[in-house]
Design a protein with these regions (language model features):
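Secretory targeting and sorting signals
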Residues: 1-31
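Metal-dependent phosphoester-hydrolase catalytic domains
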Residues: 23, 34-38, 195-201, 209-321, ...
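N-terminal carbohydrate-binding accessory modules
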Residues: 32-48
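Active-site beta-strand/loop signature of hydrolases that rely on acidic residues for catalysis
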Residues: 47-54, 67-93, 133, 159, ...
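Active-site-proximal beta-strand/loop segments in catalytic clefts of secreted hydrolases
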Residues: 51-57, 81-84, 107-113, 133-137, ...
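Active-site surface patch of divalent metal-dependent phosphodiester/phosphate bond hydrolases
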Residues: 58-144, 220-226
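A well-ordered secondary-structure block
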Residues: 120-168, 172, 257-260
Length: 327
């Protein structure tokens, strides 16, 4: 029989042990909402998408409360998170719902289980990888590990949801570390093959590569990033998305046009939030960065007067908006 004092000591020891087992993703603060900037939306904004590498390990006090506030500032319809622990995403989603009234469905694409990163129990560590939050329901979830992840397991996930009121395939990926170019090239090949199957797709993620990196050629051949100044042939100033002043994060659009976009640095990650408002693809609009569209009233064509240095060449659109011959 255990005395009252002994029972209390035993109970305290159990609590301490459980707290240690739960690991770094255990609750780290009360559910106190952080105030949002003036003008922040009160409801989910239709057709707004976001990608964010939330940084792990970045487990200071109040991280998930702060992450939720960053997302709520823009209230996107679809959010792709990388370096995401399942437990952290659950808390972020709870904060979004109960503190800001933003309700999201969630799907996961965990590529490994890691107690050191994501807590849990030694025999059941937390999942780590990608996650997608969507205001609309999601179906047909796929989670794929790349054959070669590089120095750490990497992969992509995909879901079908609604954007602009129509089904769209949303991908979320995190490619190999920055000094593993050959590995990333193979990973892009795997991802691009699947993206090419869908006329309407949005690819979110941390590609760990700058826009003119050779390994991204496969993506530029299929889609365009939401930043018109970022691309293999763009000549403008490409806005960076990391604390080390590089562009690693992308929202690739296929079958959509970018309406506007923004980059928001964050205290809660070494990556910035990249968000964009998108709309259906308009016939005749040239989408490749680094090109201009010239309207010629004397001819029945539209063409790029400065063809981008792009694997599939410059595009010519006839007056009826249908693609013409490639030059």
């Amino acid at each position: 029989m255990v005395s009252g004092t002994g029972a209390r000591l035993l109970s305290g020891a159990v609590i301490v042990t459980c707290a240690a087992l739960l690991g770094p993703s255990a609750p780290n603060g009360a559910h106190t909402a952080k105030p949002l900037p003036a003008g922040a939306p009160e409801e989910v904004v239709p057709n707004r998408v976001m990608t964010w590498n939330i940084c792990n390990p970045c487990n200071g006090s109040g991280q998930n409360v702060g992450r939720a506030a960053e997302i709520a500032t823009y209230a996107p319809q679809v959010v792709g998170l990388q370096e995401a622990c399942v437990r952290d995403v659950e808390r972020i989603r709870d904060h979004l719902q109960y503190q800001y009234g933003l309700v999201y469905h969630v799907e996961y694409g965990s590529v490994l289980r890691d107690w050191g990163r994501c807590g849990g129990l030694p025999w059941s560590p937390g999942g780590f990888g990608q996650a997608v939050l969507s205001a609309a329901p999601m179906t047909d979830r796929a989670s794929v590990e790349y054959p070669d992840g590089g120095s750490e397991d990497r992969g992509y996930m995909a879901v079908t949801t609604l954007v602009d009121g129509r089904p769209v395939r949303v991908f979320n990926t995190h490619l190999a570390h920055r000094h593993q170019e050959a590995v990333r090239a193979e990973q892009v090949g795997v991802l691009a093959k699947e993206v090419a199957r869908h006329d309407r797709s949005i690819v979110l993620g941390d590609f760990n590569a700058v826009p003119d990196a050779p390994e991204l050629t496969g993506m530029w051949g299929l889609a365009t990033d939401v930043d018109p100044e970022c691309g293999p042939s763009a000549t403008g100033i490409c806005e960076t998305t990391t604390d080390w002043h590089t562009k690693f994060d992308y929202i690739f659009l296929r079958g959509f046009d970018r309406l506007e976009h923004g980059v928001r640095p964050s205290h809660y990650s070494d990556h910035s939030l990249l968000h964009a408002d998108v709309g259906p693809k308009q016939p005749g609009r040239l989408s490749h960065p680094g090109s201009r569209v010239v309207f010629r009233p004397d001819v029945k064509e539209l063409r790029a007067d400065t063809p981008p240095r792009h694997p599939n060449g410059s595009l010519i659109f006839a007056a009826n908006g249908m693609p013409g011959n490639r030059t």
